[in-house]
C-alpha cells in the first residue's frame, strides 16, 4: 500500500534524501517485535528544505511518514550567488555542534554524513561544513537546521540597518 502512494506522488521537483534507518526491537513474551525509524530530508534545491522522522513496522511506511513530515515542515534559507551561504554560522542541538562556512566557486560541498545530504537538498553547491561533538544523525540534522535558522539574507540586514546592499557588502560608502 505504501509503495502505491509513493509511485502516485506528483513529481514536484523536490529532492528526497534518506539519511538514516534505525531498527528498533521490543521484547515481548513471544519474542521480539521489530520496528523501523527513518530520517528523511526533502529540498527543492533552491533554498527550501525540511526534515522528518517516521516510525512504522515496515521500512517503506516509515520512509513515507518521514517524507510527508519533511514536506510539511519546510524552511527557507538565503542562498548567495555561487550556491553558498552569506557568512560563517554555527548550530547546536544537544551534544552535536556543526560549523558551516561559505566557500569559493568550484569548491563543492565539503561535508560529511547527514550534513552533506542536507546541504545538497537545500541547493548549496559551495560550502565547507564540519560536525563536532555527537555524530548522531538526528542531532546533526537538527544542529544543521539550527545553523540555517541563524542565517539572515544580506537584503534583510541592509533593510534592518537602513543601509544599501552595497554598504553591507563592503563595496563603498566609507568616509575614511
From Swiss-Prot:
Keyword RNA-binding carried by entry: yes
A GO term, aspect molecular function: structural constituent of ribosome
Domain spans labelled S5 DRBM: 14-77
Gene Ontology biological process terms from the UniProt entry: translation
PROSITE patterns, per database record: S5_DSRBD
Coiled-coil region(s): none
Record flagged with keyword rRNA-binding: yes
UniProt keyword list: Ribonucleoprotein, Ribosomal protein, RNA-binding, rRNA-binding
Pfam families noted in UniProt: Ribosomal_S5 (PF00333), Ribosomal_S5_C (PF03719)
InterPro entries: Ribosomal_Su5_D2-typ_SF, Ribosomal_uS5, Ribosomal_uS5_bac-type, Ribosomal_uS5_C, Ribosomal_uS5_N, Ribsml_uS5_D2-typ_fold_subgr
GO cellular component terms listed in the entry, alphabetical order: small ribosomal subunit
Protein role: With S4 and S12 plays an important role in translational accuracy. Located at the back of the 30S subunit body where it stabilizes the conformation of the head with respect to the body.
Assembly information from the UniProt record: Part of the 30S ribosomal subunit. Contacts proteins S4 and S8.
Domain notes from UniProt: The N-terminal domain interacts with the head of the 30S subunit; the C-terminal domain interacts with the body and contacts protein S4. The interaction surface between S4 and S5 is involved in control of translational fidelity.
Family: Belongs to the universal ribosomal protein uS5 family.
Protein name (record): Small ribosomal subunit protein uS5
Gene that this sequence comes from: rpsE
